[in-house]
């Protein structure tokens, strides 16, 4: 599970294919919902973030229940 969340916190980047983790913790709050979905298109449902992060990044998702 932890690795899925790591993927969600990375921007889509060719460097990721080499296994390098790009730390964008500061930028993550500013990422749009679209960018987050691009960062992890398959794992977005499996990647459960703390509710604090969900409110900051994906306001609409809270209506679906976590």
From Swiss-Prot:
Phosphorylated. Phosphorylation does not seem to be required for recycling to the host Golgi apparatus. Packaging is selective for underphosphorylated forms. A lipid is attached at residue 2 (N-myristoyl glycine). Pfam families: Herpesvir_UL11 (PF10813). The keyword Membrane applies. Signal peptide: none annotated. Coiled coil: none annotated. Keywords: Host cell membrane, Host Golgi apparatus, Host membrane, Lipoprotein, Membrane, Myristate, Palmitate, Phosphoprotein, Virion, Virion tegument. GO terms for cellular component: host cell Golgi membrane; host cell plasma membrane; membrane; viral tegument; virion membrane. The keyword Kinase does not apply. Plays an important role in the cytoplasmic envelopment of tegument proteins and capsids during the assembly and egress processes. Also participates in viral entry at the fusion step probably by regulating the core fusion machinery. Belongs to the herpesviridae cytoplasmic envelopment protein 3 family. Interacts with cytoplasmic envelopment protein 2; this interaction is essential for the proper localization of each protein to the assembly complex and thus for the production of infectious virus. This is Cytoplasmic envelopment protein 3. It comes from Saimiriine herpesvirus 2 (strain 11) (SaHV-2). The gene is 38.
């Amino acid at each position: 599970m932890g690795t899925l969340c790591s993927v969600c916190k990375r921007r889509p980047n060719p460097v990721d294919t080499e296994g390098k983790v790009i730390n964008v913790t500061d930028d993550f709050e500013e990422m749009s919902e679209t960018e987050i979905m691009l960062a992890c298109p398959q794992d977005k449902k499996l990647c459960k973030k703390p509710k604090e992060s969900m409110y900051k990044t994906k306001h609409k998702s809270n209506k679906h229940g976590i």
